Design a protein with these regions (language model features):
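Acidic, metal-coordinating catalytic segment for phosphate/diphosphate chemistry
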Residues: 1-20, 93
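Short secondary-structure boundary/capping segments
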Residues: 13, 95, 112-114
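A cytosolic small-molecule/anion-sensing beta-strand core signal
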Residues: 25
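Conserved Nudix-box catalytic region and its N-terminal flanking loop in Nudix hydrolases
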Residues: 28-70
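Active-site segment of metal-dependent pyrophosphate-handling enzymes
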Residues: 69-110
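NUDIX/MutT-family hydrolases
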Residues: 102-106, 112-144
Length: 145
């Protein structure tokens, strides 16, 4: 892990690469209300940064385990690459730029979800999340054609 001051410099100077896993059950998507900046307080897809020298598949497995408490049983379906620009970050007066790789993963049962990153979770129908003011605009982008 990077020292906090070095990581702050990275966030302030370069884009971060992240993975979002869109958890699907039937016609609904699982979203969590974010505790941390950026996008604090919004319902957002589950995801995390890719670490240096970490293969995408390994990052996906780590994020699924840490953020969802699940072991991936199959490879999630690739959705696309998206850019997320935020005016804030975990640091004061530092914006955030993510290059985000989105995947979709079908689940039959809801796992015991951790609460370190999200204060609550909710299943949204796609039309419902597209209309909700509580769902961040970048999540909505995954479902717009």
């Amino acid at each position: 892990m990077l020292d906090d001051q070095i990581f702050k410099t990275v966030v302030d100077s370069a884009p971060l690469i992240s993975i979002d896993i869109l958890i699907k059950k039937g016609n609904k998507i699982l979203l969590g209300r974010r505790i941390n900046k950026p996008a604090q307080g919004y319902f957002f897809s589950i995801g995390g940064r890719i670490n240096k020298n970490e293969a995408i598949d390994n990052a996906m497995a780590r994020v699924a385990l840490n953020e969802l408490n699940i072991d991936l049983k199959s490879t999630p379906e690739f959705i696309g690459v998206f850019e997320h620009f935020y005016d804030d970050s975990m640091y004061e007066n530092v914006s955030t730029h993510y290059v985000n790789i989105a995947y979709e993963y079908e689940m039959e049962e809801t796992p015991d979800l951790p609460t370190e990153q999200h204060s609550e979770y909710q299943w949204f129908a796609i039309d419902e999340l597209l209309e909700s003011k509580q769902v961040h605009k970048y999540v909505k982008d995954y479902f717009r054609n």
